[in-house]
Amino acid sequence: MANNKSALKRIRQTKKRTERNRYFRTRIKTITKKVESAVAEGNYEAALEAWKEANKKFQGYINKGILKKNTARRKISRLHHLVKSIEPSA
């Protein structure tokens, strides 16, 4: 266990950051799974709506500094390719 004040503060900060990171990691996974499950069902409308919601969330995470810009855009792009793969041809 740490003995000096600065080490104790670092431990407190690490706990707080770990909790926050865990929260956002699970949110990202949940958002992604929502799109993937709609694609797996073959429901284009639901998949598109889920993708729009994911896009909005990821853009917010970019603005808050939770996700790096390229990481979020890569995730959005991959999800969009999934949704487009089940798009009904007109």
Curated annotation (Swiss-Prot):
Alphabetized GO MF terms: small ribosomal subunit rRNA binding; structural constituent of ribosome
InterPro entries: Ribosomal_bS20, Ribosomal_bS20_sf
Sequence intervals crossing the membrane: none
Alphabetically ordered keywords of this record: Ribonucleoprotein, Ribosomal protein, RNA-binding, rRNA-binding
GO biological process, alphabetically ordered: translation
GO cellular component: cytosol; small ribosomal subunit
PANTHER family, alphabetized: 30S RIBOSOMAL PROTEIN S20 (PTHR33398), SMALL RIBOSOMAL SUBUNIT PROTEIN BS20C (PTHR33398:SF1)
Similarity comment: Belongs to the bacterial ribosomal protein bS20 family.
Protein role: Binds directly to 16S ribosomal RNA.
Protein name: Small ribosomal subunit protein bS20
Gene that produces this protein: rpsT
